[in-house]
């Protein structure tokens, strides 16, 4: 059960809370997806939890429910070139800051352990296991990113993106060695740096 400390603090006053989380900091290829979510005041759904604790089927079900129920949500998709230009930490921070500055009415923004230079933003360690708004954002980000990678699997079936979603599994590294790197790869990541770029 999520403790929802800040929701319990602000909801009784009729004030909205925004949660922000990301998916895709670790993969070797594909985008980083950052999502924000503002759930209705006093919203309840005991199934919503940190996306990493949920099955793929459950995440997909909750994605549809959150999209339907949310007061507001938004996505930022950060492409590999931007990740390489800024580094993954600063690319994540930049996207979260932009989402936190939304003009949609909310009293405070909660992030999952990402400090942002904004007095209305609170970074919470393991926030996706503490706040329903962050947990909802984590589900939105994870499901959207997985679907993007499944789309790339159609374009590049030889890499097996549908299975590993771009993470550095043994199978994925073997496919990188066999086929080289396409434009989806993050060249600032060490496993990519040591492999030759495949030109198209």
Language-model features: where?
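RNase H-like, Mg2+-dependent phosphodiesterase core
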Residues: 1-200
């Amino acid at each position: 059960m999520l403790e929802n400390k800040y929701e319990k603090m602000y909801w009784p006053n009729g004030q909205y809370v925004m949660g922000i989380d990301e998916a895709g900091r670790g993969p070797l290829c594909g985008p980083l997806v950052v999502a924000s979510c503002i759930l209705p005041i006093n919203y309840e759904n005991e199934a919503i939890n940190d996306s990493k604790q949920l099955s793929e089927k459950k995440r997909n079900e909750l994605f549809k429910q959150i999209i339907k129920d949310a007061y507001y949500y938004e996505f930022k998709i950060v492409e590999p070139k931007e990740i390489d230009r800024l580094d993954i930490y600063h690319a994540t921070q930049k996207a979260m800051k932009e989402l936190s500055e939304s003009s949609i009415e909310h009293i405070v923004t909660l992030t999952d352990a990402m400090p942002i230079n904004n007095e209305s933003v609170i970074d919470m360690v393991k926030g996706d296991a503490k706040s329903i708004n962050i947990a909802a954002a984590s589900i939105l980000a994870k499901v959207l990113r997985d679907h993007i990678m499944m789309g790339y699997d159609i374009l590049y079936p030889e890499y097996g993106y549908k299975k590993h979603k771009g993470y550095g599994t043994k199978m994925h590294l073997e496919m990188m060695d066999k086929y080289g790197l396409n434009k989806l790869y993050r060249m600032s990541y060490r496993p990519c740096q040591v492999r030759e770029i495949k030109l198209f």
